[in-house]
């Protein structure tokens, strides 16, 4: 009699119950592990999350969150997550002030692990000035109720986390610009600061900004918008300087809960948008890219409390005035007097001060003498070289430098044109001098590769246009060569400021010929002021320039003086209607509606405002 299908099924079930479960070969002979209890589930939390209403999930549960959460919820929108809620807890998500993950726990350490933290922080110790030799560096301040300077960082209430980072940086004491600028900014005053290159200007404005944001981190941002709402924006004229400020600000803000993001042109915008979506308290940007983000409605200026312009005179002088004015006055940025504005640069000519004053309210002008950048630290040489002899003269300098300086020493060569930079780079490489170049026509990736190659010493000669002259902190630059002198003495000051940094000595060599005659007077004055030896032939050129109306350098030992203290700036009403007194341009004193009585605040008869 044949067995039924039910009997066959029962017999197979009995056999299967008598067989041990199959174990793969690589797992055999191992002790069995206890089975983990199932994770709690509920209708309101994500996978493994806490019940709704709890702000934090325990570390062992793997996160999750209640409804309203998400990967990031700056504006109340739902992001990524499992279950009915999302990635964040409570009403939050990543970077939400009222809930979600603590960004400090998830922050990537920019310095590696703790063992590597200390050496990285000690790379730059009080860059720019030999403090023991320059205790008497001249400082001028003007404006009402100027806060007194401080002598140590311990005298300043910046917050525990920021003070810890300052100690990690081995910043023993504030630089002259920091001693005066930080108390002014902590007092919530607007500031226009003029200080030498390499004097610590970046830290001077970053410390108060980070400290101010740390103290008010409970402030809620608007909800229901795709835009991010930073509390501070720092504008820079070049991509390289923006990246440098970003790196420094990230170091200062480490473990403070303050998120710093950089945005600049020349690269695809998508990666920068992703960084912004992860949260942004401080936005470092170039004017063009920031305008792009504002027009896309991906960034809002509505919550801005701090506006900083680094190398402000360069931005205004390079033609960024319309873009900056649009950002500051035509978007939703709070007006001056509500936000705090700070402008920093190594030079502030009076014309630029007049423009910058439109952004500020009852500001303090701070001028720190540039003694440390031009006396003992930098030896300035001016050599008469005809155009046709410049290459051979440069080769002689480089050969002599090879014999006298160590392998770490770098040489920065400035030229006037982009084509000249490429041509000189190729010529140096053909003559067995490893060189690279940066200028405005190179892509951002090419510029970053060139700078990295130069900083590491793989190509110890960098040929550059003025794009590299402003603000960049490149260590070990022993020699700056002005292959082509600039047309303006302020650009010369910025160029030679690339050497003599971090308390190290440097050499600045300039090739001068008849084409540079208009610079002779100001160049001779600068060298005399710095106790440098002025060649007799340069003195003769300078005297000719004096008779011919050559340009006189303003500001003396400083990069500029407060134009409000000049005789041309008088707040009387007698110049109204363009008829009173005589201003800087000879077009009428300041009275009535503006400079020279112009009803719209112009600069007097015959002078076109840069804002027009």
From Swiss-Prot:
Q: Where does ATP bind?
A: 195-202
Residues of the region (Disordered) are 1-70, 83-104, 547-583
* Keywords for the protein's UniProt record, in alphabetical order: Acetylation, ATP-binding, Helicase, Hydrolase, Nucleotide-binding, RNA-binding
Where does the Helicase ATP-binding domain start and stop, copy by copy? 182-366
Start and end residues of each Helicase C-terminal domain: 377-542
Q: Which GO terms describe its cellular component?
A: cytosol; nucleolus; peroxisome
Q: What class of enzyme is it?
A: hydrolase
InterPro entries found in the cross-reference section: DEAD/DEAH_box_helicase_dom, Ded1/Dbp1_DEADc, Helicase_ATP-bd, Helicase_C-like, P-loop_NTPase, RNA_helicase_DEAD_Q_motif
What EC number is given for this enzyme? 3.6.4.13
Identify the Pfam families for this entry. Answer: DEAD, Helicase_C
Modified positions (N-acetylserine) in chain numbering: 2
From the record, which residues define motif Q motif?
Answer: 151-179
Q: What is this protein called?
A: DEAD-box ATP-dependent RNA helicase 11
Tell me the organism: Arabidopsis thaliana
- The UniProt gene name for this protein comes to RH11
């Amino acid at each position: 009699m044949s067995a039924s299908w039910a009997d066959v099924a029962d017999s197979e079930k009995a056999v299967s119950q008598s067989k041990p479960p199959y174990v793969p070969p690589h797992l055999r002979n191992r002790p069995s592990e206890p089975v983990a209890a199932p994770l709690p589930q509920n209708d309101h939390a994500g996978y493994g999350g806490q019940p709704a209403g709890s702000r934090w999930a325990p570390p062992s549960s793997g996160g999750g969150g209640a409804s309203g959460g998400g990967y990031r919820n700056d504006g109340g929108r739902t992001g990524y997550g499992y279950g009915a809620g999302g990635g964040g807890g409570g009403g939050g998500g990543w970077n939400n002030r009222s809930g979600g993950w603590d960004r400090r726990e998830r922050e990537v350490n920019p310095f590696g692990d703790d063992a590597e933290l200390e050496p990285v922080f000690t790379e730059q110790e009080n860059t720019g000035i030999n403090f023991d030799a320059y205790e008497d560096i001249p400082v001028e301040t003007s404006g009402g109720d100027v806060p007194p300077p401080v002598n140590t960082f311990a005298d300043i209430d910046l917050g525990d986390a920021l003070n810890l980072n300052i100690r990690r940086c081995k910043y023993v004491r504030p630089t002259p610009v920091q001693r005066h600028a930080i108390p002014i900014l902590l007092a919530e005053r607007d500031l226009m600061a003029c200080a030498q290159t390499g004097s610590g200007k970046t830290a001077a404005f970053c410390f108060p900004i980070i400290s101010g944001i740390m103290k008010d981190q409970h402030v809620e941002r608007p909800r229901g918008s795709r835009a991010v709402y930073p509390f501070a924006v720092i504008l820079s004229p070049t991509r390289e300087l923006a990246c440098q400020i970003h790196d420094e600000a990230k170091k200062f803000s480490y473990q403070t809960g303050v998120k710093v993001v950089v945005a600049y042109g020349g690269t695809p915008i998508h990666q920068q948008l992703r960084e912004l979506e992860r949260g942004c308290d401080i936005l470092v940007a170039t004017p063009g890219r920031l305008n792009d983000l504002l027009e896309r409605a991906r960034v809002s200026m509505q919550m801005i409390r701090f506006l900083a312009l680094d190398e402000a005179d360069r931005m205004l002088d390079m033609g960024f005035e319309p873009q900056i004015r649009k950002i500051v006055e035509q978007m939703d940025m709070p007006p001056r007097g509500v936000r705090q504005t700070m402008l920093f640069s190594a030079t502030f000519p009076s014309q630029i001060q007049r423009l910058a004053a439109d952004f500020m309210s009852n500001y303090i002008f701070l001028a720190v003498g540039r003694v440390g950048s031009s006396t003992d630290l930098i030896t300035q040489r001016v050599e008469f070289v005809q155009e046709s002899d410049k290459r051979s003269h440069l080769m002689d300098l480089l050969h002599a430098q090879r014999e006298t300086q160590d392998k770490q020493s770098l040489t920065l060569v400035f030229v006037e044109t982009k084509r000249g930079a490429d041509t000189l780079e190729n010529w140096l490489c053909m003559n067995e001098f490893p060189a690279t170049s940066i200028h405005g026509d190179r892509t951002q990736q090419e510029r970053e590769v060139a700078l990295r190659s130069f900083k590491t010493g793989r190509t110890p000669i960098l040929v550059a246009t003025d794009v590299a002259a402003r603000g960049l902190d490149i260590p070990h630059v022993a020699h700056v060569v002005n292959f082509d002198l600039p047309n303006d003495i302020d650009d010369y000051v910025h160029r030679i400021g690339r050497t003599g940094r971090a308390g190290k000595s440097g050499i600045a060599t300039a090739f001068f010929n008849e084409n540079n005659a208009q610079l002779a007077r100001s160049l001779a004055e600068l060298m005399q002021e710095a106790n440098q030896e002025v060649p007799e032939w340069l003195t003769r050129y300078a005297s000719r320039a004096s008779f011919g109306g050559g340009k006189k350098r303003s500001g003396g030992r400083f990069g500029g003086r407060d134009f409000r203290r000049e005789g041309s700036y008088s707040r009387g009403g007698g110049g109204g209607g363009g008829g009173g007194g005589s201003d800087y341009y000879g077009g009428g004193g300041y009275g009535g509606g503006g400079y020279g009585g112009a009803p719209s605040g112009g600069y007097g008869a015959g002078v076109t405002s840069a804002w027009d």
